[in-house]
UniProtKB/Swiss-Prot annotation:
The organism of origin for this protein: Histophilus somni (Haemophilus somnus)
Keyword check for Ribosomal protein: yes
Record's protein name: Small ribosomal subunit protein uS9
Organism classification: Bacteria, Pseudomonadati, Pseudomonadota, Gammaproteobacteria, Pasteurellales
InterPro entries per the UniProt record, alphabetical: Ribosomal_Su5_D2-typ_SF, Ribosomal_uS9, Ribosomal_uS9_bac/plastid, Ribosomal_uS9_CS, Ribsml_uS5_D2-typ_fold_subgr
GO cellular component: cytosolic small ribosomal subunit
Family: Belongs to the universal ribosomal protein uS9 family.
Amino acid sequence: MAENQNYGTGRRKSSSARVFIKPGSGKIVINQRELDVYFGRETSRMIVRQPLELVELTDKLDLYVTVKGGGISGQAGAIRHGITRALIEYDETLRPALRAAGFVTRDARRVERKKIGLHKARRRPQYSKR
């Protein structure tokens, strides 16, 4: 791709995103589709835009994202994490602001496994006294 671009990898749940940023007009492309087309939910779009709005670079950078795995929420979180890492590579002075907002830390929460003898991870069968 271009010489003056920065890269960041983001992960959340079982999703993984590769984010490339370069100077531009604020266009966000995810898997060859516009942000508004890819994410139907407004909350997911907001999550993706959060790091850019925080550092006020929304209309100064173009983003090219490839994301795979997981669901809508996990993918949005992975993209946010990737954008954050790419922004830090772009300008290291943005790190404290992004850290304070909690975007730099990888959310390590995963789905808890189902246990035998239980309905789900923690849901027990109904107790019958008699």
